[in-house]
């Protein structure tokens, strides 16, 4: 069974998904980050594939992408490192990247490497749902990889219902029209509007402290924290900075 599916069967609320950029703060950081987050009982880990032009991301994640690329991280290195820690990591791993990266690497090879690396799902925010349905859905289903869809405050009710039927296991709710890392800009009227959608939801963008985390937990099954986590982790004392942030956010 897909690990994301199993998680949502066994846990119905207060799900915490932590995002970080592969190859940041150093090219060798990822295994330690994964192990530490697992030991701290984080539910899902989302790993960003570094990209030179991350459209939806704010300053913090953009800088982590730049640093990661300078460190030598790329998709091949990412899969290599994930394969090395696969037997130690039991929590679901989701990769987040861009459609161009997916195509350039080779779609079939990308999905095969996901399976071999223990990845449970993919987020490709700029992959049009129509293209996914026509070209990739059968491949995803065959590989048992989840395809996660994002919705924003600008998503119409009609489109929202359609996307709810496409996504696997949960919807990624973008809490505002801002880029990632924007503090205290959560669109509460939007969260009220999607509250009754009968699909599990995780809220991201702007979840940075206990207050915003509690808002996410109120309106959805869980939250996604990215920029705040990346800002908090330090190369020189990586393990301690991870533990300090997680304990702060869930205290």
UniProtKB/Swiss-Prot annotation:
Its EC number is 4.2.1.20. InterPro entries: Aldolase_TIM, RibuloseP-bd_barrel, Trp_synthase_alpha_AS, Trp_synthase_suA. PROSITE patterns: TRP_SYNTHASE_ALPHA. The active site is at residues 46, 57. SUPFAM superfamilies: Ribulose-phoshate binding barrel. The alpha subunit is responsible for the aldol cleavage of indoleglycerol phosphate to indole and glyceraldehyde 3-phosphate. Tetramer of two alpha and two beta chains. This is Tryptophan synthase alpha chain. It comes from Karelsulcia muelleri (strain GWSS) (Sulcia muelleri). The gene is trpA.
């Amino acid at each position: 069974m897909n690990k994301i599916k199993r998680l949502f069967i066994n846990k119905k609320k207060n799900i915490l998904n932590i995002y970080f950029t592969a190859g940041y703060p150093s090219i060798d950081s990822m295994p330690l980050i994964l192990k530490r987050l697992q030991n701290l009982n984080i539910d899902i880990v989302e790993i960003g594939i570094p990209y030179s032009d991350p459209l939806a991301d704010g300053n913090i994640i953009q800088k982590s992408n730049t640093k990661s690329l300078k460190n030598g991280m790329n998709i091949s290195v990412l899969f290599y490192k994930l394969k090395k820690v696969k037997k130690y990591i039991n929590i679901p791993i989701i990769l987040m990247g861009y459609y161009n990266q997916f195509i350039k690497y080779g779609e079939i090879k990308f999905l095969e490497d996901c399976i071999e690396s223990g990845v449970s799902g993919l987020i490709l925010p700029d992959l049009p749902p129509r293209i996914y349905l026509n070209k990739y859905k059968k491949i995803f289903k065959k590989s048992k990889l989840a395809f996660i869809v994002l919705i924003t405050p600008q998503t119409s009710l009609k489109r929202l219902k359609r996307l709810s039927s496409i996504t696997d296991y949960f919807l990624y709710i973008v809490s505002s029209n801002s880029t990632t890392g924007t503090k205290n800009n959560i669109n509460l009227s939007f969260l009220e509007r999607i509250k009754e959608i009968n699909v599990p939801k995780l809220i991201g963008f702007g979840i940075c402290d206990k207050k915003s985390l509690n808002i996410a937990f109120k309106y959805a099954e869980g939250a996604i924290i990215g920029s705040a986590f990346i800002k908090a982790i330090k190369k020189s004392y990586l393990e301690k900075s991870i533990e300090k942030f997680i304990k702060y956010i869930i205290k």
